[in-house]
Amino acid sequence: MDRRTYLKSGIGVLGGGLIAGCTGDGGSGDQATTTAESETEMETETETDTPTETATATPESNIPETVLIGSDIPYRPFEYQTAGGDLTGFDVDIAEAVFEEQLGIGYEFQATSFDSIIPSLNNGNFRIIMSAMTINDTRDEKVDFSDPYFTAYQTILVRADSSISSRADLEGEVVGVQKGTTGAGAAEELQEEFDGDLELNRYDQITGAFQALTNGQVNAVINDNTVNAERASQTDELRFVEGDGVAADSDQDAPPYLTLTIENYGIAFREDDDEFLERVNEALAAIREDGTYDEIYSEYFSG
């Protein structure tokens, strides 16, 4: 697999878990700290007791002047910090295209644990979620989703010298997953299929699962294909488990590795935020129509 570097000029860190995006007038937030990108977990704000969203709406509408976005950071290549402390990634660029360029409003990202991100949204800690979040029935009972903006697959990442070459080979092994994710859900389904003969180690962030795989504490990681690919592109020590899977069975243009699920990402809203949801859907359609979406996609995932 060819190695790639997914870096792009991004946005400054404001501190306190808040990461600034561009404002409606085209300016960007001042960078208050410079943080080298690390495989360790970022400080996150996970409290759900007190609403913190303060952005005001534009006159005679429910559209904010600046939208506060909850996101589990880092989650390369969707949202992460560069060595210079800038926030970048596919979701970040989509946010810029949707909110700044289409809706003319500012945006800020707030780092939040994925496991508690939906309760935090519904408690008013931020306005929306953009965090490579899969649309599924369980989440749809608690939030409303935008139209899908990305298709992903759950995949299996192992060490290069591993004897694991199929999903069946996972029986009796130890698998690392991130808490609250559909990767964890896919692993739990395998655990049931194997009558419990699959041990799951759950981590607050996917970087913890990747580190455990490298260190030999788990034998595989189940996670989104693009995030697994980003990690595998950085080292010769990791590889995908290959073979046909759900995508191939569905006659889709399947990736060249085993797929456990087919999923669509969406932007999550509180269930009473219909006007803003509609405007965001219109903006998503517009960036697909004018080619902006394809440009962003090609930057992170083509080649």
Q: What label would you give each PLM region?
A:
Residues 1-112, 116-169, 173-303:
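Terminal disorder- and signal-encoded targeting elements
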